[in-house]
Amino acid sequence: MALNLSKKKTIVSKINQISNLALSAIIANSQGISVNKINELRKSGREIGVKMSIVRNTLLSLAIENTAFKCLKKKLKGSTFIAYSTKHPGSGARLFKEFEKKNKKFKITGAVFEGKLLSELEINQLADMPTYEEAIRKLLLTLKISIAGKLIYTLSAIKEKKETS
């Protein structure tokens, strides 16, 4: 479907606005994936604050020109599906990694975090990064275990002191 100039400008403007608000971005080649599967992925993304779109490479290239994601331009080939993480930096990467495991035709081609193009290993690390809530939960659990351990140690020391007296 041919797009007129005003529609193209609208798309570029919209992608540029999202790019300026996003914490990270990840792109993948979605060629060969059914529309139903893509729609399921988009639905999952909306639930966790990931904005996704399939955009022509030339329009995407223009939209990310003056943003932290301009280094993605080198990776724009084929059918590009881009996801921006707006709430947690690893959300999009985690979502795409899970989808890639289930769909062999879906290939992650690049990602950017804090203006840096990430390697495959770094993309995996970004996907594995805990969310804010998960990190707080782990911290509280560690503190709880630490406090409980100190209490047990103190009680056993008091018990030993009473037994020796």
Curated annotation (Swiss-Prot):
The UniProt entry, under InterPro entries, shows:
Ribosomal_uL10, Ribosomal_uL10-like_sf, Ribosomal_uL10_bac, Ribosomal_uL10_bac_type, Ribosomal_uL10_CS_bac
Pfam families on file = Ribosomal_L10
**Known PROSITE patterns for this protein?**
RIBOSOMAL_L10
UniProt keywords (A-Z) are: Ribonucleoprotein, Ribosomal protein, RNA-binding, rRNA-binding
Heme keyword on record: no
GO biological process, any: translation
Cellular component aspect of the GO annotation:
large ribosomal subunit
The Gene Ontology terms for molecular function here are:
large ribosomal subunit rRNA binding; structural constituent of ribosome
Record bears the keyword Ribonucleoprotein: yes
What does this protein do, in the record's words?
Answer: Forms part of the ribosomal stalk, playing a central role in the interaction of the ribosome with GTP-bound translation factors.
Record family assignment: Belongs to the universal ribosomal protein uL10 family.
Complex and partners: Part of the ribosomal stalk of the 50S ribosomal subunit. The N-terminus interacts with L11 and the large rRNA to form the base of the stalk. The C-terminus forms an elongated spine to which L12 dimers bind in a sequential fashion forming a multimeric L10(L12)X complex.
Q: What is this protein called?
A: Large ribosomal subunit protein uL10
The species this protein belongs to is Buchnera aphidicola subsp. Schizaphis graminum (strain Sg)
